[in-house]
Amino acid sequence: MAKEAFLRKKPHINVGTIGHVDHGKTTLTSAITYVLAKKGLAQKMAYDQIDKAPEEKERGITINTAHVEYESDKRHYAHVDCPGHADYIKNMITGAAQMDGAILVVSAADGPMPQTREHILLARQVGVPYIVVFLNKVDMVDDKELLELVELEVRELLNQYGFPGDKIPIIKGSALKALEGDPEYEKNILELVEAMDNYIPIPERPKDQPFLMPIEDVFNIEGRGTVVTGRVERGTLKRMEEVEIVGIRPTTKTVVTDIEMFRKTLDTAEAGDNVGLLLRGIKKDDVERGQVVAKPGTITPHHKFNAQVYVLKKEEGGRHTAFFNGYRPQFFFRTTDVTGTVTLKEGVEMVMPGDNVEFMVELISPIAMEKSMRFAIREGGKTVGAGVVTEIIE
């Protein structure tokens, strides 16, 4: 029992497999669990256990995702694998599975294919910070020069999309052979895990980031003043600290004179806490749902941005028809809807349900915004799309 408690001390990292259909993403995921299970660091997961991923809902969108856990000597990994290409797009855009790093699987027999490109581009757009490459099926390639060519091609492709292609670790192997227990190929799986350990840094924990709390409700407490409530998204806050209220209206500064949780006073609020903050000198009408309380100078309001968006199919509860330039839905950021106008890219006539598309949005009021932030697109309270901010314009 004591051993179990000790294991939880390892730092936690979220990863996932990406790459073209049939290049071996799920086989690799399974192989990692098989090889690490021999060292007592994972539970074996067979290919079909992973492939029959259960459906999940994220922001009103149904996604099939398999979640696998394993450990290296240094770390604890949560690994996501999606059966279908559309699931990947939805997963990456909604941030259902936020990745600290991705394992790009490329078949050595085929080289990079269209979805290889699409997944690298998506990783860049949604802010996946690190990629390691597993060059799979090398047992099917006899020609060493051909292998080198494929490796060069992959590095070139990564460079094209703004990843450091020359520095990224590329591990060659065969997931299937490793699954079959071939010791030579099992070694490659351990090399891959080692590359992940060394190349993907441990992310900064939400607690260590600058304080931010989206406002969900505003109350007036007789004789005390205005209280805003919400769930702390990141960072920590102490009583009597100065904060900014950002978004929708001009930014204002105030001091948090009291922090309450479950009707008790707290000295410090931290990421994950549901709290009420008493704000000095702020009237109930000065603040509203949709604004954020943040550490001064750490987040700014914006109204114009580029986004990568997945538009729901009719079967997913989305629109039944295409939309055109000038489309004006609601954009749901954190806790509130803001109306915005869509400008499609040059040469794009319309957007169909089921499309994965990039366009510009101009909101009618500014929102506290950061690159890689997620949002939903809604019409009359119904989700019709999911998006991520790829670039802030103004």
UniProtKB/Swiss-Prot annotation:
Keywords: Cytoplasm, Elongation factor, GTP-binding, Hydrolase, Magnesium, Metal-binding, Nucleotide-binding, Protein biosynthesis. It comes from the Bacteria. Residues 136-139 are annotated as: G4. Its main location: cytoplasm. One of its GO terms (molecular function) is GTP binding. Signal peptide: none annotated. GTP binds at residues 19-26, 81-85, 136-139. Residues 60-64 are annotated as: G2. Residues 174-176 are annotated as: G5. PANTHER family: ELONGATION FACTOR TU, MITOCHONDRIAL, ELONGATION FACTOR TU-RELATED. NCBIfam families: EF-Tu (TIGR00485), PRK00049.1 (NF000766), PRK12735.1 (NF009372), PRK12736.1 (NF009373), small_GTP (TIGR00231). Belongs to the TRAFAC class translation factor GTPase superfamily. Classic translation factor GTPase family. EF-Tu/EF-1A subfamily. This is Elongation factor Tu. The lineage of its organism: Bacteria, Pseudomonadati, Verrucomicrobiota, Methylacidiphilae, Methylacidiphilales.
